[in-house]
């Protein structure tokens, strides 16, 4: 198999052996997240019921947890799956959507953080608030620039011993010591609902492919998303046509193009 040292190599490896990713995500995101994984070459499974979430985690190669549409029953499933995934030594990704908005969400995320996610992905406002700072987030939308969250991300990564990804106009990834920025994407991406949620699932797919290099896997997922976004924007008239063009661009993206066009710089 090709060495997994570049985003393109990881994309190739994922397509050669498609990982099964358990995606506990919100109602809004399920369809697009599943289609994003299929377009990229992975296999999605939207399994969240508490009665089976832990058992299914034993089958899946990675888990992603998104708290966009919460209920007590869903939290039970999230915790069960996270415990089983951790016990099996597999990676899992936490997407703390608008965790600062209500006490219910804050409590849910505190419980999930205690279960030690291997990767945390959020927007700038979510990461700032997760690190105890004052964010300007409004509902699920970020009002803070990514660069303002970089210090919070480094602190959170060290505290949680996890990879932290802050996504926005320019993405930022850190493990507390190393850090990079990924440039690319399109201004149309925030105009398509749940596209960020689907990115969390893609991070899980790359993490399943390269569990020995979770930092590199996270960077590769974000770079893949960014280049697909750039390609999709070329012929898009607006967010509607961008959405389906994005799936086509992701499906068509090859390793050589990804490695040639990915803009990743040390931070």
Curated annotation (Swiss-Prot):
Q: Which residues bind ATP?
A: 121, 167
Keyword Nucleus among UniProt keywords: no
Catalysed reaction(s) here are:
5-(2-hydroxyethyl)-4-methylthiazole + ATP = 4-methyl-5-(2-phosphooxyethyl)-thiazole + ADP + H(+)
Q: Which SUPFAM superfamilies match?
A: Ribokinase-like
Recorded hits in CDD domains, A to Z, give: THZ_kinase (cd01170)
Q: Which UniProt keywords apply?
A: ATP-binding, Kinase, Magnesium, Metal-binding, Nucleotide-binding, Plasmid, Thiamine biosynthesis, Transferase
Q: What is this protein called?
A: Hydroxyethylthiazole kinase
Write the gene name.
thiM
């Amino acid at each position: 198999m090709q060495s997994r040292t570049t985003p393109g190599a990881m994309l190739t490896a994922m397509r050669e052996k498609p990982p099964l990713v358990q995606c506990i995500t919100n109602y809004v995101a399920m369809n697009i997240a599943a289609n994003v994984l299929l377009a990229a070459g992975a296999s999605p499974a939207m399994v969240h019921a508490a009665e089976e979430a832990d058992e299914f985690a034993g089958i899946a190669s990675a888990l992603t947890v998104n708290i966009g549409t919460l209920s007590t029953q869903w939290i039970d499933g999230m915790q069960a799956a996270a415990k089983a995934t951790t016990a099996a030594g597999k990676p899992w990704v936490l997407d703390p959507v608008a965790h600062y908005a209500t006490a219910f969400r804050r409590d849910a995320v505190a419980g999930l953080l205690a279960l030690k996610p291997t990767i945390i992905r959020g927007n700038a406002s979510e990461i700032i608030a997760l690190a105890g700072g004052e964010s300007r987030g409004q509902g699920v939308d970020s009002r803070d620039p990514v660069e303002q969250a970089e210090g919070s991300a480094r602190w959170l990564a060290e505290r949680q011993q996890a990879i932290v990804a802050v996504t926005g106009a320019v993405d930022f990834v850190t493990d507390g010591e190393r850090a990079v920025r990924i440039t690319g994407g399109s201004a149309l991406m925030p105009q398509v609902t749940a596209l960020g949620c689907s990115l969390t699932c893609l991070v899980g797919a790359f993490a399943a492919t390269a569990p020995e290099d979770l930092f590199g896997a996270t960077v590769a997922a974000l770079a893949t998303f960014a280049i697909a976004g750039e390609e999709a924007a070329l012929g898009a008239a607006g967010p509607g046509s961008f959405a389906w063009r994005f799936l086509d661009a992701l499906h068509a993206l090859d390793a050589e193009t990804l490695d040639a066009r990915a803009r990743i710089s040390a931070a």
